[in-house]
């Protein structure tokens, strides 16, 4: 991937893991609020000590109001300015999540064309689906960083920023005078997050990295699909993993800066992020052991756990993970209690080993019922189940509707539906600001930072 003509390195967040971080960030925001009451009576040094959360709070404009009426100043990262040298997915997904929490994102784009991710498709009112998903609530600043005037403008903005997120080729920022060691000397409180395919060191440092290539390098394709037919993820999972990792580390770095007063450098690798997500398959194959078998949409080692045909209405997903559930399933769903005594299915390992025979038994029973009837019966018996949804089913999902998870964001092509950030305590306490046009905020940003053109 290329950013401003350079190399691209392009995120599902664990709500539970981020909840503690968000509470800590809210606490830090409260510190800022208390420090404001003392600001006028402090020297600049005293004020900096009090205002440990944001480097640039005194340069901040009034909190913006999004289309739903929520003040971004109420959110945990209000007061944090992030400069983003980003394209594709990993960087933009990282910074969009920061924006969701109230951070100000100044997205640097190529004049005229902007982020190349704007042009991958035109599926959303003529806009790219990838770009729409990852770039709401941002300001677009079009700069040609090959021109000294524009590079100087960026450096001036960085002097008042809290975080720099970039996914240029390793070494590119150093050539522009924007390497971490240089920035550290000039702006010791600045947090710099570098996202790349393989990291800033090692033999793969300069190797091109696209999402599917990282899926392959990380072994992901070896555990998806069916034997002889490896399958990639249907989403940009390696990019998302890297964006998620960057997001989490930036939150931690902001909290750490509140303790030490110092910025830091984060070196996020797509490969390392994806390797972390390989979870049990990686440990399954430890010490030279055989990896888990490829099992399509089924679980590799637990059975029955996967999709099953019915008599009509499509497949159903079901799963069970203990002997109590297996007994209920045999008695109440299959009406075959004797199966619990069948030596072929005596435990999870044997059921997995003999899954072909067990599948035949299950689908023979299900063949007399419609999918909805099977799901209702499973639900009544307390057996975990799910519909095998497509994207239309997701848009219409009754649970998302019941929890008021949909909103609209403004864009250059009008209002676009969007999913609210996962994990918001109150559905009204979310930020859903517009998706910007290329260079839409140039004039306002130049004026704010006193940049002459």
Role assignments for model-derived ranges:
Residues 1-71:
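N-terminal mitochondrial targeting presequence
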Residues 230-241, 263-265, 294-299, 303-305, ...:
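A short glycine-threonine-serine/GTX helix/turn-capping micro-motif
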């Amino acid at each position: 991937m290329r950013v401003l003509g350079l190399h691209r390195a392009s995120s599902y967040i664990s709500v539970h893991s981020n909840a503690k971080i968000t509470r800590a960030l809210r606490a830090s925001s409260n510190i800022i609020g208390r420090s404001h009451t003392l600001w006028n009576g402090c020297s600049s040094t005293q004020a900096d000590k009090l205002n440990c959360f944001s480097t640039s709070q005194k340069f901040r404009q009034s909190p913006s109001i999004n289309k739903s009426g929520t003040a971004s100043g109420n959110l945990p990262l209000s007061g944090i300015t992030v400069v983003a040298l980003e394209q594709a997915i990993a960087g933009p997904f990282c910074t969009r999540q920061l924006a969701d929490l109230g951070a100000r994102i100044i997205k640097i784009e190529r004049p005229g064309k902007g982020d190349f991710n704007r042009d991958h498709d035109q599926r959303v009112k003529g806009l790219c689906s990838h770009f729409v998903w990852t770039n709401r609530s941002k300001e677009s600043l079009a700069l040609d960083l090959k021109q000294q005037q524009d590079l100087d403008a960026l450096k001036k903005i960085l002097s008042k920023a809290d975080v720099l997120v970039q996914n240029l080729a390793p070494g590119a920022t150093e050539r522009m005078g924007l390497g971490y060691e240089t920035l550290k000397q000039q702006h010791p409180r600045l947090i710099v997050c570098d996202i790349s395919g393989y990291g800033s060191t090692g033999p793969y440092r300069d190797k091109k990295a696209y999402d599917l290539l990282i899926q392959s390098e990380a072994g992901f394709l070896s555990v998806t699909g069916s034997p002889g037919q490896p399958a990639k993820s249907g989403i940009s999972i390696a990019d998302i993993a890297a964006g998620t990792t960057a997001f989490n580390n930036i939150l931690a770095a902001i909290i750490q800066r509140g303790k030490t007063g110092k910025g830091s450098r984060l070196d996020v690798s797509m490969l390392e992020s994806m390797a972390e997500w390989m979870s049990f398959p990686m440990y399954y194959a430890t010490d030279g052991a055989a990896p888990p078998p490829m099992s399509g949409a089924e679980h590799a080692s637990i059975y029955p756990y996967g999709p099953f045909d019915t008599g009509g209405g499509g497949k159903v997903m079901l799963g069970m993970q203990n002997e109590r559930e297996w007994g209920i399933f045999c008695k109440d769903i299959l009406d075959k209690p004797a199966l619990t005594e069948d030596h072929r299915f005596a435990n999870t390992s044997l059921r997995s080993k003999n899954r072909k025979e067990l599948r035949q038994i299950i689908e023979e029973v299900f063949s007399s019922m419609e999918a909805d009837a099977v799901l209702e019966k499973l639900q009544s018996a307390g057996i975990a189940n799910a519909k095998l949804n497509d994207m239309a089913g997701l848009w219409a999902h009754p649970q998302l509707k019941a929890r008021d998870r949909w909103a609209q964001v403004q864009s250059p092509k009008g209002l676009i539906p969007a999913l609210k950030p996962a994990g918001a305590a109150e559905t009204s306490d979310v930020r859903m600001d517009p998706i910007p046009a290329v260079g839409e905020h140039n004039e306002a940003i130049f004026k704010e930072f006193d940049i002459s053109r």
